[in-house]
Amino acid sequence: MNGQNRNEISPGAEVYIVLKKDQRSGKRTHGVVKDILTNSPFHPHGIKVRLKNGQVGRVQEIIKKWL
């Protein structure tokens, strides 16, 4: 899953995000979602989330959904 739809992401989901500082390189950061920051149901560049470690970025790939 590509992380563009808000309804596919929930707190506790395991994801890869791209941090703002890594947007040019595309370097991805692995983590677990703590908060969903994007309010709209869809975002073409990925839903913005805060990971449990405090990092903020846009979801590029959902590894495991929290059920």
What role is predicted for each listed range?
Residues 2-67:
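Basic/aromatic-rich interaction segments and small domains that mediate binding to polyanionic partners
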